[in-house]
Amino acid sequence: MRFKGLDLNLLVALDALTTERNLTAAARSINLSQPAMSAAIGRLRDYFRDELFTMNGRELRLTPRAEGLASAVRETLLQVQCSIISWEPFNPSKSDRCFRIVLSDFMMLIYFNKIIERVAREAPAVSFELLPLDSDPYEMLSRGDVDFLIVPEFFLSGAHPSAKLFTEKFVCVACSTNVDLPSALTIEQYVSTGHVAAAFGRFLKPSVEGWFLLENGIQRRVEVVVQGFSLIPPVLRGTNRIANLPLRLVEHYESTFPLRIINLPLPLPVFTEAVQWPALHNADPGSIWFREILVEEASRMMSSNAPKIHGLLQQSGS
């Protein structure tokens, strides 16, 4: 099938090549043989009158022309998929759809497990692929590689629709066996005490509280950096270090790790967790159904599971 001289099948090949950046992987992703994919590259070069790709070992490097085409081609294919191919009534009880979702370990532990339980009852054949926060989840969102991104509202992209889920606050914690640490710290004590901090992605981007401290000119003595909040309690145990954690995660680990809340002379940030989805999925019935579940469960959690900070403060001797 040709449109203005372009074989439309070549757009699928071009999308695979710009996504995978590897000839073999691109061919495999669309069930083509490697010789057939090589032939497709030749035809693409002829049509666009550009080299499009150069080889660097096994990696395909995109020319500026190919870089410019990549997002336009992906958006076009997504529009076809969402508006034509996938447009049909969504029946949760019969659907076998797999939702790909990027979220933090914190959200998995204190929130998303409830989503999984509910979906198992209402849509038993629906499945999930849960992905960690990468260095650039927004590119995955724009390309339609993921269905949802669940992050603090602070980190949302302005290019896609979103919905608020719930608010959360950070608290400073220490191991309860650290008897030398007072129940309240001065700002000098806070910045000079060794910290365990969470970071995300290949480039170890700081979390919300990390950005908050940086923007307010507060330089901590970070001694240990871990990938995600859930690794902080076991690393903190038995040490003289402190850390900042979401309050609900502290409560989640209350019976597992000896944690106590430390009072600080500065307020740590309150933040809002939110969900974002590709703009092209905005009218997708399956996406709408799942978004409603996310918001409903967040509302239910907020009303029935208010943080129990007072008990943890009493453990700290305040």
Curated annotation (Swiss-Prot):
**SUPFAM superfamilies tied to this protein:** Periplasmic binding protein-like II (SSF53850), Winged helix' DNA-binding domain (SSF46785)
Keywords in UniProt for this one?
Activator, DNA-binding, Nodulation, Plasmid, Repressor, Transcription, Transcription regulation
The answer to whether the entry has keyword Repressor is yes
The record, for InterPro entries, names: LysR-type_TF, LysR_subst-bd, NodD_PBP2, Tscrpt_reg_HTH_LysR, WH-like_DNA-bd_sf, WH_DNA-bd_sf
Q: Does the keyword Mitochondrion apply?
A: no
Signal peptide span: none
* Alphabetical list of Pfam families matching this protein: HTH_1, LysR_substrate
DNA binding happens at which residues? 23-42
Give the molecular function GO annotations. DNA binding; DNA-binding transcription factor activity
Domain HTH lysR-type per the UniProt entry, residue ranges: 6-63
Superkingdom in the source lineage = Bacteria
Q: Which family does it belong to?
A: Belongs to the LysR transcriptional regulatory family.
Q: What does this protein do?
A: NodD regulates the expression of the nodABCFE genes which encode other nodulation proteins. NodD is also a negative regulator of its own expression. Binds flavonoids as inducers.
UniProt protein name: Nodulation protein D 2
What organism does the UniProt record list as the source?
Rhizobium leguminosarum bv. phaseoli
Q: Which gene encodes it?
A: nodD2
